Amino acid sequence: MRRTAVLGSAGTLIAGTLIAGAMAAPAAGADSRHHGDREARGVQIAADRAADAGIDWADCPADWAIAAPIQCGWVSVPLDYAKPNGKQIKLAVDRHVSTGTKEERQGALVYNPGGPGGSGMAFPKRIVTKNPLWTKAAKAYDFVGFDPRGVGHSAPISCIDPQEFVKAPKADPVPDSEADKRAQRKLAAEYADGCAERSGEMLPHMTTPDTARDLDVIRAALGEKKLNFLGVSYGTYLGAVYGTLFPTHVRRMVVDSVVNPAKDNIWYEANLNQDVAFQTRWNDWKAWVAQNDAAYHIGDTPEKVEQAWLTLRAAAKKNPIGGVVGPAELIGFFQSAPYYDSAWAPTARIWSDYLGGDTQALIDAAAPDLSDTAGNISAENGNAVYTAVECADAKWPTSWKKWDRDNTRLHQQYPFMTWANAWMNLPCATWPSTQRTPLDVRTGKGLPPVLIVQSTRDAATPYEGAVELHKRFKGSRLVTEKDAGSHGVTGLVNPCVNERVDTYLLTGKTDRHDVTCTPHATPKP
């Protein structure tokens, strides 16, 4: 699940055979039986074609900023799997070949970082940078990244002019009046209309099951009999959907920081639950800042840190910092701390420096760079994909009374993120395209053990999601980092977690029972 700025506020999301093989089961309840059968046949046809065509690997285009020895290529997929011979779109993929011997190589490891709307094209760089946490896996696997449909170089979608999207300051996401709410509702409806105007042809085909089908076509194009997959955040839901649709096509699957896959959680309830988890982790960070008051001088109790935050918000609302940083931009910056432990010290330092008179560091961190054209296009695209996927995946409440009631209630106890998250997702209430019924994620015949990794205090994907997927994927193993909260645990600093991920990827073996790891060390100021 992703973090970004949207509309009038800042918000979060929430990081096979050469021939496709047996026909995948259609998504239960996601389509009519007839349409689901057509999509199942369509993905088989597309995978057959991709297996025959392969991927023409070559140096990456210069403007992609991906240097050799990483290679890039394209995989063609149907826009609509019910019409496999209709319009095709091209998906960008890249790879770094395994560093081991021919005997050590086990295939390709395909990665999705989450979002929805995140690009996986940076994944192969983990080999180039010689990250020691990935050395063993790099000997066994080609590291493969891709831009999912609608993202980056893969038929990118857009909902609003990028310069308009990033302009600041935006309205305070916490409404002071009914007029404030009406203004935000208007922005949300206009944003949804903009998606239809700029990207209408793509919108009905931006679902997670569509991307899972793309993943199976990529598998076939890679020449892989079965898929090895690493998914983080939203990538865990993509993996869960893939595992349900194509259980016999999975070889190894690691899912890290898990979206709750229950049908009634996708996606409205997921975002409400996220508001609660963000407040919990925000409180953890405030306590840490208070414990380290000698370094930061923000407040020596969590209550004083909270008061300092409210004072900062109020001042920025009255007079935006540098003319561009108001409450929305502050939330967009400060939410890094609940997301990632690695952001705790840098975020506190910038805040401390601001209180000491250095405003520029906070402006640089929180305000958009209007001169960064490429970055702003990417940010707008990522937000458009986030919205399109979540709105298309499920039927959302259309009654403003329900949205207002639920978020007003939540804000009373969990104020840090609630309204920002609500406005970010409100376009789904007036979504101008098809909304499906989520897939019933379950263990299918032939699905191997899946490794699930999760910290208990994750803000973006609450721990209950990992427990739910563990119940649904029989034979899976759950590795829990207790009393920790970083979003995306794999490859960080906990050897208890990393050793089990390595062992699973290299051997397919898991512990006989679920494992609870002690937390990694608390960040130092």
Task: Place the predicted regions along the sequence by residue.
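Secretory targeting and sorting signals
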Residues: 1-31, 75, 215
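An N-terminal domain-start capping segment
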Residues: 13, 18, 26-27, 42-56, ...
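Solvent-exposed, charged interface segments at domain starts and junctions
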Residues: 31, 62-78, 82-83, 87-91, ...
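Gly/Pro-rich cap/lid or specificity-loop segments adjacent to the active site
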Residues: 36-329, 388-525
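Alpha/beta-hydrolase-fold enzymes
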Residues: 288-390
